[in-house]
Amino acid sequence: MIELVLTILDLGMILVLLYMADESNKENESHAMMASLLSASFHVALMYIILYMPNLRVIPMGYFSLLGLAVLLLLIPRKPNLSALIGIRGYVIGDPPRPDERDSVTRRYRLVKGTPEYEEYYLRHPEREEIDRVHRKLNRIDGTIDGGYRPNVSMIDASFSIPPHMKGIAFAEPRKEPYDISPEKSTVIAKGLANHLGAKVVGVCKVDPLCVYTNQRTLWEKTWTVDGEEQGYPPYALVMATEMSHTHVHAGPHTPTAAETGNQYANGSYISTVMAHWFSGMGYTGIAEHTGHYDVVLPPLAVQAGMGEIGRNGYLITPTLGSRVRLSAVLTDMPLVVDEPIDIAVEEFCENCMKCADTCPSDSIPTTEKTEYNGTLRWKLEAETCSAYWNQVGTDCAICMAICPYSKPDTPLHGVIRWLVNHSWLAPKVFPLMDDILYGKNWKVKPVPEWLDWKD
């Protein structure tokens, strides 16, 4: 009887490990594939002991007893993160100001010296003027790291040329009388349409003032609105995330990653614009929020919409796609059913995982605990050094997005791991170490298809 039980357990482990090896091979994860195959070989040796060396069966019995204990420990539920379940307000410890869009490095690089907007901003932030002056001259996404490889750089330019065209039609006024429909039904339709158009994750929230910019300058405009009068923003936001290709992202910091960034920003501008005009046709206001037109900060808005949590790398981390997403949204006054913020153990996992910080080529990601910044607890990135590296390589890097353990493909195997991290007391503590063992601690660029290969 013991022999049969041990045989079944060991055979099951062999099959699981071979499945892991196959999945790792498909993901171009050679380190994980070899680790899985070596583990499978160990279990083949155990099978030999079980079947042909009865005097040594105490070894597999002890091994599976320890394995069973580990499984039981993994099944101990963790305590919920109450701050995460509150949303962005759960991390407020002071009186946070509303965000100024000029605090975003890529936005303020477009400030023109001698204008009132320039003088007013650097009067308040003199420490940023000189470093911004240097970086402003270098600000580019031109594929320097790949020698400006034209096919890929042209992909980047082509995709980023789309959002400016969408900007002019971002605001959609009601075209008809409001359609008589319940909030429940309208929410189902809006989410379904957004999914159909290409959004992989969709959520709804009330627009929190902490997400609304005070000083706006959309990326493609030439003038700022400086401390202007308060505008009445629609109360609801439909927030959408499109998926960044796993293959493209794992080529970071090379040009395929930047090409995919442009592609998903273009997709987001299209989806949000279509959704804005759908709300318009339903008799309500729709304002598309995308890389060509921002009124709000999208990551915290997505947190409010129950789409994920903000990780150590500063990105929104979603339950199924991790950091591999780009965000867009629509502000509307159409009554919708709001989602609640979620807790997927990101904070606890990131506290035990330094992978993004350790591999960041510009050391821009903190290795410390969350600290207070503008009245909220957060992992504050060094945006200036991050941007300087972008300028150096001529892409948007994305190594931190790619190496994040949450960013693995949405497969059954990784789904089980995500479920355990979300529910287990032990998993967020030990799985960062397991990820290092299986996938390695250091960043390694993965191969890309021939049509994306920058190496002539």
Model-based region annotation:
Residues 2, 6, 10, 14-17, ...:
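Flanking helices and flexible, charged tails adjoining ferredoxin-like Fe-S electron-transfer domains
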Residues 2-247, 254:
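Non-catalytic, usually N-terminal nucleic-acid engagement modules in DNA/RNA processing proteins
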Residues 28, 301-307, 442-444:
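Glycine-centered secondary-structure boundary/capping sites
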Residues 153-179, 311, 316-333, 452-453:
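Amphipathic repeat-derived elements
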Residues 200-422:
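Catalytic cores of enzyme domains
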